[in-house]
């Protein structure tokens, strides 16, 4: 069903659950390393493997960072919260239960204000932020798109099992209408910026450091009661969040219009076409048979400790943006463009690395954003760091690279050929400084274009572009355009 048709009949109600992997050195309940990227099943221990008799010990840093996230989300912090066992059987959960929090979360009743593409603010209310441990990772072999359906075998990697997670759960988002997909994207983006600013997570959606579950239901316009919801699991990019919700709105509306019913189920997002596919029936809280974990005491967070943590909060993203907008004298529209391109933090870091704001903006918003779009990845997942941009800007300023050569250097960085200096050396990109070679190229170009020489001497000085182009082609773009123009003017004087 067409998106506009959906909105004529139905009101979407949305809820977002975002799992944020904390960047602690060790796991939530054991001393095993929590680092990403190790060999499969190398960061494991008796606790994360669920071996008999192994007892959990709470990671104090994980609790501190959970409180920090709660405070930044304007939540109330519970003086006493508890861990609970969430019971279910799945190969990536060695204990057959997950240590989580149920009816006594560490943070609750907060909000996060997000800015939409046209500058409108929307307040997303937070129901809770609770601590839990991550599961292991399954790799399915022989199935479709890596899914379990049709798989001939499944491999289990328990490195991730026990890594600290904070799950941030929104209250139902009502009244969003056509803007529901945009609000979801803006919220996830704002939450990612927040945890990165706090220094508690790298917020990498592409690596699973943040994973989004999107709950959606439709109800006829004017109806108060919620419809049956579906939960699209483990969405791993901002674009995918927007597409998944858009597709689910259209799919559910079509089912309802055809006289069908919506099944309460999980669904899988398909990156290839932006659709969702059927998963499994969705459990209720009762199905998990939660009960307080008898191996873990309550988590006590005295007011004094909470206030000490509050005092350590860094400049938060929205405060930073207001300061930057004033310092750089940006209009509201210019600021929105940077935010909508997910480029602002990268630009700020590039300026901190030594460029001017205009130089940093020119690179991130144009050429590098274009490359990210062509690759279908988020800007910060392209492989270009602020230090790379600062380096090419410096080399252009020093006359060692032209803008064209600088773009080739960035291409090499994206291709994984090394840092900027390594790419310049390997590709031989540095500007030609052989005056004799450049002068010969200019002489050859002038000799090959007598009509342009004649027009120039007749007073049309704008025709030299073709000569400059011929020289740049002859030198494979390595001549300094300013030097070429000076030589042309000198020879035609």
Curated annotation (Swiss-Prot):
* Pfam families (alphabetical): GatB_N, GatB_Yqey
Compositionally biased spans, kind Basic and acidic residues: 280-291
Q: Which UniProt keywords apply?
A: ATP-binding, Ligase, Nucleotide-binding, Protein biosynthesis
Give the top-rank taxon of the lineage listed in the UniProt record for this protein.
Answer: Bacteria
Q: Where is this region: Disordered?
A: 268-291
Provide the top EC class. Answer: ligase
Query: What Gene Ontology terms for biological process does this UniProt record contain?
Result: glutaminyl-tRNAGln biosynthesis via transamidation; translation
Q: Which SUPFAM superfamilies match?
A: GatB/YqeY motif, Glutamine synthetase/guanido kinase
Reaction catalysed by this enzyme = L-glutamyl-tRNA(Gln) + L-glutamine + ATP + H2O = L-glutaminyl-tRNA(Gln) + L-glutamate + ADP + phosphate + H(+); L-aspartyl-tRNA(Asn) + L-glutamine + ATP + H2O = L-asparaginyl-tRNA(Asn) + L-glutamate + ADP + phosphate + 2 H(+)
Q: What is its EC number?
A: 6.3.5.-
Q: Which GO terms describe its molecular function?
A: asparaginyl-tRNA synthase (glutamine-hydrolyzing) activity; ATP binding; glutaminyl-tRNA synthase (glutamine-hydrolyzing) activity
The record's function comment reads: Allows the formation of correctly charged Asn-tRNA(Asn) or Gln-tRNA(Gln) through the transamidation of misacylated Asp-tRNA(Asn) or Glu-tRNA(Gln) in organisms which lack either or both of asparaginyl-tRNA or glutaminyl-tRNA synthetases. The reaction takes place in the presence of glutamine and ATP through an activated phospho-Asp-tRNA(Asn) or phospho-Glu-tRNA(Gln).
What PANTHER family would the database entry show?
A: GLUTAMYL-TRNA GLN AMIDOTRANSFERASE SUBUNIT B MITOCHONDRIAL AND PROKARYOTIC PET112-RELATED, GLUTAMYL-TRNA(GLN) AMIDOTRANSFERASE SUBUNIT B, MITOCHONDRIAL
Assembly behavior = Heterotrimer of A, B and C subunits.
Q: What is this protein called?
A: Aspartyl/glutamyl-tRNA(Asn/Gln) amidotransferase subunit B
Q: Which organism is it from?
A: Corynebacterium glutamicum (strain ATCC 13032 / DSM 20300 / JCM 1318 / BCRC 11384 / CCUG 27702 / LMG 3730 / NBRC 12168 / NCIMB 10025 / NRRL B-2784 / 534)
């Amino acid at each position: 069903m067409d998106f506009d048709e959906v909105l004529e009949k139905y009101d979407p109600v949305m809820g977002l659950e975002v799992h944020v992997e904390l960047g602690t050195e060790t796991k939530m309940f054991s001393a095993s390393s929590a680092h990403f990227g190790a060999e499969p099943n190398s960061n494991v221990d008796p606790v994360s493997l669920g071996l008999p008799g192994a007892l959990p010990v709470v990671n104090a840093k994980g609790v501190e960072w959970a409180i920090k996230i709660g405070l930044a989300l304007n939540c109330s912090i519970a003086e006493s919260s508890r861990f609970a066992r969430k019971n279910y059987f799945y190969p990536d959960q060695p204990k057959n239960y997950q240590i989580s929090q149920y009816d006594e979360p560490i943070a609750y009743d907060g909000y996060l204000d997000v800015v939409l593409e046209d500058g409108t603010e929307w307040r997303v209310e937070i129901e809770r932020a609770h601590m839990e441990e991550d599961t292991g990772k399954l790799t399915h072999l022989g199935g479709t798109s890596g899914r379990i359906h049709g798989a001939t075998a499944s491999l289990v990697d328990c490195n991730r099992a026990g890594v600290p997670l904070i799950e941030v759960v929104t209250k139902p988002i009502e009244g969003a209408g056509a803007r529901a997909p945009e609000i979801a994207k803006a919220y996830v983006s704002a939450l990612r910026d927040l945890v990165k600013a706090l220094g508690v997570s790298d917020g990498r959606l592409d690596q699973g450091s943040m994973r989004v579950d999107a709950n959606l239901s439709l109800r006829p316009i004017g109806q108060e009661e919620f419809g049956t919801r579906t939960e699209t699991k483990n969405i791993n990019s901002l674009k995918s969040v927007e597409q998944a919700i858009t597709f689910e709105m259209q799919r559910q509306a079509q089912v309802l219009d055809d006289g069908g019913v919506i099944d309460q189920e999980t669904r899988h997002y398909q990156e290839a076409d932006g659709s969702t596919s059927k998963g499994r029936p969705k459990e209720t809280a009762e199905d998990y048979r939660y009960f307080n974990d008898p191996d873990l005491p309550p988590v006590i967070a005295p007011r004094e400790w909470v206030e000490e943590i509050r005092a350590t909060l860094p400049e938060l993203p929205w405060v930073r943006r207001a300061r930057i907008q004033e310092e750089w004298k940006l209009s509201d529209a210019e600021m929105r463009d940077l935010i909508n391109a997910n480029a602002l933090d990268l630009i700020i870091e590039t300026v901190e690395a030594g460029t001017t704001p205009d130089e940093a903006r020119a690179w991130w918003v144009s050429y590098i954003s274009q490359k990210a779009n062509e690759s279908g990845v988020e800007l910060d997942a392209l492989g270009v760091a602020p230090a790379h941009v600062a380096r090419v800007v410096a080399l252009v300023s020093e006359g060692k690279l032209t803008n064209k050569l600088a773009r080739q250097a960035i291409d090499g960085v994206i291709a994984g050929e090394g840092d900027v200096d390594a790419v310049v050396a390997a590709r031989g990109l540095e500007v030609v400084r052989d005056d004799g070679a450049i002068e010969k190229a200019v002489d050859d170009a002038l000799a090959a274009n007598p009509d342009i020489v004649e027009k120039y001497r007749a007073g049309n000085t704008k025709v030299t572009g073709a000569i400059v182009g011929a020289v740049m082609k002859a030198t494979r773009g390595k001549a300094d355009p300013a030097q070429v123009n000076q030589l042309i003017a000198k020879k035609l004087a």
